[in-house]
Amino acid sequence: PPLRGANSPGPSATPVPGPNTVPHTPRLRNTPASPAARTLENPRQAQRRNDTGKDRGTHRQRAETPSRSPVPTTNTVGRHAPAVRRQRRTQHAYGPQHSLEDPPRGPAPAVFWVCRGAAGWVCAGCVAGVCWVCRGCVGRVCQGVSRACAGCVVPGVSRACGGCAGGVWWRGVSAVCAASGCAASQERVCGLAAVISPAVPRAVVPRPRALLFVCPQGPMLPSPGNFLFSPGNHTDTDTRLLFAVRAARRFYSPSPSSAPHATSRRPHTQLQVSPPR
């Protein structure tokens, strides 16, 4: 056969694609590669994409490439954390999940105790016999209520209240039932500190005589200017509690003759306080 030069046309000038040759197609700049071509890229470049979340020149979402850590990261701090959102979703104004330490959320009732006729003075925040104790008063207006003891006849007192429940100012003590004697399993401190110990179980706690709540005898809370309602005049807790019990007997008894006394043996009828209907 005749010799052919390099510039002479012939069958060798146009190569025939074989089974192992890939036709070359030029890529435009900043065009994302196909998923099949991405598997052939440098592992270091793929790691850089996982760290930054996007390629240089293209905005590719992190969800396209698997994350390095098998556990998805969640926001654990700040106001968008799951625990904060769950608490904000389940916490009501005065719900049973509200603790004594946290301030209550939501509007507080303007009047804490209201007169219910034959039922006497009834707590404005009672729900199914559960008494809600004042956590801070300005005059006779309660600034907030908090859950205390279940079924207290005499309202409890709290360390933030200066004029509730007989005017006893409790310092460093959580909500206390003044005369019913809540057990330690229900409250941190029982009512009559001189008589009842917090370590005594509720079954053996001697319940004192319940005090009567009678509406015609006057307002539930006397004037805040009374010495019983000023926190600075008494420093001893037991003395203040004794004054509170005496004041409660004087204000809530239907008459001085039927007021309960420690030496009296005649039967004393109790007036059960029912929740508002």
From Swiss-Prot:
Residues 1-103, 254-277 are annotated as: Disordered. Residues 66-77 have a biased composition (Polar residues). Residues 82-91 have a biased composition (Basic residues). Residues 48-65 have a biased composition (Basic and acidic residues). It comes from the Viruses. This is Uncharacterized protein HKRFX. It comes from Human cytomegalovirus (strain AD169) (HHV-5).
